[in-house]
Amino acid sequence: MAKVIGIDLGTTNSCVAVMEGGKPKVIENAEGARTTPSIVAFAKDGERLIGQPAKRQAVTNPDNTIFAVKRLIGRRFDDPITRKDTELVPYHIVKGPNGDAWVQAGGEDYSPSQISAFTLQKMKETAESYLGETVTQAVITVPAYFNDAQRQATKDAGKIAGLEVLRIINEPTAAALAYGLEKNDGKTIAVYDLGGGTFDISILEIGDGVFEVKSTNGDTFLGGEDFDAKLVEFFAADFQKAEGIDLTKDRLALQRLKEAAEKAKIELSSAQTTEVNLPFITADATGPKHLVKSLTRADLERLVEPLIQRSIEPVKKALADAGLKAADIDEVVMVGGMTRMPKVREVVKSYFGKEPHTGVNPDEVVAMGAAIQAGVLQGDVKDVLLLDVTPLSLGIETLGGVFTRMIDRNTTIPTKKSQTYSTADDNQNAVTIRVFQGEREMAADNKMLGQFDLIGIPPAPRGVPQIEVTFDIDANGIVNVSAKDKGTGKEQQIKIQASGGLSDADIDGMVKDAEKFAEEDKKRRAAAEAKNNAESLIHTTERQLQEHGDKVDGGLKSEIEAAIADAKTAVEGGDADAMTEKAQALAQVAMKLGQAIYEKEQAAAAAPGEEAPKDDDVVDAEFSEVDDKK
């Protein structure tokens, strides 16, 4: 039975795990790392790079290196958060054909789902390489506070990557699964998950294999990227004050600054002070300029204090929704790379009044939880029941633009709820059902998930027709809505696709693009291997010809030189098949060279030289027996 893998598709890093021997195991990628940067780059020659290779060239190729795309997934281009993100990244965010936020790289426009799919493909290949078999199914994690559009876009990314997404699972819930799998004592825990781009807080009750989420809250635009941005802002302002040059206008300088900021932030988790040293960061008429700046942990904490405090408001709301106080929490589990920061731990400890639990690996625990959920779905993990919740209230727009809730936030999923509405005007023969998600009282202030029409309602006075609206949320947190006229039995239903979102045709096209990229990657790999083999053979043959050329006749020498020239021409051409063909031809001729060299050596060895001494002159060794007993 094929394995189902668990993937943590992170803003900054991604991780893949699988159940092995009843325990989740994190799989190392081709570079030997347990996590993979969620970065995709398009090189000048059209090559697509994913993970560490993409990160390494980001400084020299900022326009075409896409990172933190998870913050754009499922978002509209005109969303204020998208506008804010545009100011933070060196690459171009553009308006997609459906009004969603897309990115531009290598002269092409890509949806965030497509870019995420490239990272998922890398995770899929990592697992396949380890397992030695094809992987087609996965459980993928998302921030608990992701709305329906963001969840649907993540599922689309999985489909584009060639994966059937069996379940979308919330990151804090996944972390709780990994933390509490072998713990049977009843506990109320808080999972504080501060990652690269998002923040979640979930309150759970765990015990006897049951993981019940009581409440969840969060901020989908709060994470390590924002901490880095504060540092970049600080360094850029300091440099502008000293040199009068705005580094944020220079994409290359901005990328160098971002990398330096991230490095400084990480160093200050273990050191009290660090130095940022960026020579030749820019230049003006007076010559090159260098950025050299010392930074202390206290400086960093002062800069990011407002961001850390921003995480406490969702914590308060989650506790209130669960009907609990901070003192009622038995354990606070810290998840996400940013929880390594001493100040974050200090603030959490201060709020909950207890030392947070840091015994889980914050970068890997979510993927491990996803693998456990995969094991549950596959039947490998028994006696585990996961009860998650919907993070935001769902409802429809009613008369006067009011948001009428159908399903309240923190309702356990899957769930289904129906309510009956009527018409607003006499003889109204159609109604438009507009579906929203959020907590505001007016529909327009919430996130519109989609709309559809129920037509063919028989003429009647207002308030007479009976229209039953049903909301159905599946275990992935994805919404289906239907409306039925009770009088005629006519029904209309939609699986909510965000007012933007990707259509099935869009996804099919992107699947084909992903396959094309995978095929191109294979061709590039084959070409690189063929080139390496050909160049190695050329070098070896040239060396042998140089050392032993005097031992072969002119005809063979010319044949070898011609074969070397053909192989070099093929290498310059870059075609894998041509390089392989010419390398094979050169190998055949090289064998003749080796044969000729050996024949020459043997002939020289057999040539008459000095006469060997006769047997008569050979003297036998003389020896006498020694008796040890004497």
From Swiss-Prot:
InterPro entries: ATPase_NBD, Chaperone_DnaK, Heat_shock_70_CS, HSP70_C_sf, HSP70_peptide-bd_sf, Hsp_70_fam. Coiled coil: none annotated. Residues 604-630 are annotated as: Disordered. The keyword NADP does not apply. It comes from the Bacteria. Induction: By stress conditions e.g. heat shock. PANTHER family: HEAT SHOCK PROTEIN 70KDA (PTHR19375). This is Chaperone protein DnaK.
